[in-house]
Amino acid sequence: EICVEFGLQSVHNETLKFINRCQTFESFLDEYNHFKLSGIRNCIHIINGLPYETEKMMIETAKKVGKLAPDGIKIHALHIAKGTKLNKIYQENPFSLISKDDYIRIVAKQLEYLPKTTVIERITGDGDKKKLVAPMWTADKISVLGGIDKYQAENDTYQGKALERE
């Protein structure tokens, strides 16, 4: 099966500019809505913990993506890797990084805004551990996945829950 993946990352234009995405959320929407007409399966990628994004902003990204009802979604935490422009920025002017506990809680909340028809293809990633600068907790994918499961069970939260209230 063919699937086209869209690297949206965030719905916030100031963030997209900072991470050199060379597109706005509005231009993404134009492309995405046009593409959806093709009927080809699609998947949207988002990143939590992007520089200067708040929890509210990350939840807003999930809400807006949820309204698009993509076929699939991949959610990642920001990875700062050696040899990248972002690493240089981080070394020169460190910014706050998302904690593992915050990531787990935010992902659980984000899932509430995603339709049950959207396949969750990934809820954490694990980049090259040899190149990872920060946050180091992202290297322990199993712990993150277990943390999300535990949080959801303890807080009676699940994919699509917020949509049931709308």
Where on the chain are the PLM-derived regions?
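Structural detector of well-ordered beta-strand residues that form the stable sheet scaffold
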Residues: 5, 43, 74, 119-121
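Short, small-residue-rich loop/turn micro-motifs
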Residues: 8-10, 77-79, 124
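Auxiliary Fe-S-binding modules of radical SAM enzymes
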Residues: 72, 80-166
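Conserved non-cysteine loop/helix-boundary elements of the Radical SAM core domain that shape
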Residues: 1-43, 47-68, 86-101
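Short low-complexity stretches enriched in small and charged residues
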Residues: 1-2, 75-79
